[in-house]
From Swiss-Prot:
Top enzyme category: isomerase
Protein EC: 5.3.1.23
The protein's name in its UniProt record: Methylthioribose-1-phosphate isomerase
Keywords: Amino-acid biosynthesis, Isomerase, Methionine biosynthesis
Protein family membership: Belongs to the eIF-2B alpha/beta/delta subunits family. MtnA subfamily.
Pathway(s) served: Amino-acid biosynthesis; L-methionine biosynthesis via salvage pathway; L-methionine from S-methyl-5-thio-alpha-D-ribose 1-phosphate: step 1/6
Pfam families hit by this protein: IF-2B
Top-level taxonomy: Bacteria, Pseudomonadati, Spirochaetota, Spirochaetia, Leptospirales
Name of the gene encoding the protein in the UniProt record: mtnA
HAMAP family associated with the record: Salvage_MtnA
Length: 362
């Protein structure tokens, strides 16, 4: 199965090079991250975004932090730094799992027996493993998804939301990876990509990936989804996930929940594509998922994308009256009852129940 040629994360000469997704599609530029603080900035300001890509960037951030030291930090110093990393974006579970995995290698009880050189080597090896593992998992889950669609080449209309492609992962993608794999399997696709307000990941990133791949597509505003489903034959809605609770409730980019409701009304299968890294069996349901609240100006203007000096990256554009208050939750939670199936590298979970999830990931 062919993977995407897009590479948003590169590790070269002990430096992390990130495709700056804030300036796509108009400009292709890269940010060099030389420190953990650079990685935190890149995650918080969405130079890099998408739960898998955030986690991988965090893993390399740990390596950069340790590589920049001449003596081993105390456990308290290390924990403080990694807590700062975790706080950069709290909703996706993937970043937390990276930090917990690193601490499992150097637990507090045995920390005195560790040494800096060993920690540096382990951190870099772990980050590189994460990069490779995510790509393999994306390719596998995309292959698994083919069983949900006709075996013979068919014309398929699919709606997707936000950006879940190579830009959001180590490569290939989750939901958009499924779409790529359907194309590679010979299906004739038309993709309807939600623009995904307010950050416009669908318009700026997914539409760009689809165009680069030559996959026929339409960009639609988020509030057009109902019209599209009522006037066109839609075969599936496929989205990604930032965190999946024990019962299957799924946190994903804001706007996913109403899309699932519309799909349910029209009898359109609604699939979540995610790797096992998005599962969080420590929480019973979606009410326990923390929802990141972002700045109001992301809703009220197009001037919210700024570089490290505060200079706008895009032309300023005011959308609302000065002083108007705005809500800006970055995610919402889709109840498991609205999800037809969860596509993973371990297989497809359907119906979506805690029993089936635990059976798959035990």
């Amino acid at each position: 199965m062919q993977e995407s040629g897009l590479k948003p994360i590169l590790w070269t000469n002990k430096e992390l090079i990130l495709l700056d997704q804030r300036v796509l599609p108009g400009t292709t530029s890269y940010l060099k991250a030389k420190t953990l603080e650079d990685c935190i900035f890149a995650i918080r300001e969405m130079v890099v975004r998408g739960a898998p890509a955030i986690a991988i960037t965090g893993a390399f951030g740990i390596a950069l932090y340790l590589n920049g030291l001449s003596s081993q930090p105390t456990f308290s110093q290390l924990k403080t730094k990694l807590d700062e990393l975790l706080e950069s974006r709290p909703t996706a579970v993937n970043l937390r799992l990276v930090i917990e995995e690193f601490f499992s290698r150097f637990p507090e009880a045995d920390y005195s027996s560790a040494n800096l050189e060993k920690m540096q080597k382990s951190a870099e090896e772990f980050a590189l493993f994460m990069l490779e593992e995510d790509l393999e998992n994306n390719l596998t889950l995309s292959k698994n998804a083919l069983s949900l669609f006709p075996k013979s080449p068919s014309s398929l209309n699919i709606i997707t939301h936000c950006n879940t492609g190579a830009l959001a992962t180590a490569g290939h993608g989750t939901a958009l990876g499924v779409i790529r794999s359907l194309r590679d399997a010979g299906h004739s696709l038309t993709v309807f990509a939600d623009e995904t307000r307010p950050y416009l990941q669908g318009a700026r990133l997914t539409a760009w990936e689809l165009k680069e791949e030559g996959i026929p597509s339409y960009l639609i505003t988020d509030n057009m989804a109902g019209w599209v489903m009522s006037s066109r034959k839609i075969h599936a809605v496929i989205v990604g996930a930032d965190r999946i609770a024990s019962n299957g409730d799924t946190a994903n980019k804001i706007g996913t929940y109403p899309l699932a409701i519309i799909a349910k009304h029209h009898g359109v299968p609604f699939y979540v594509a995610a790797t096992s890294k998005s599962m969080d069996f420590r929480i019973p349901d979606g009410s326990h998922i923390p929802i990141e609240m972002r700045k109001e100006n992301e809703v009220t203007s197009f001037g919210f994308l700024k570089d490290a000096t505060g200079k706008p990256l895009l032309n300023e554009g005011v959308l609302a009256p000065n002083g108007i208050k705005a809500l800006n939750p970055s995610f919402d939670v889709t109840p498991a009852s609205l999800i037809s199936g969860i596509i993973t590298e371990r297989g497809i979970i359907s119906p979506v129940t805690e029993e089936n999830l635990r059976k798959t990931f035990s």
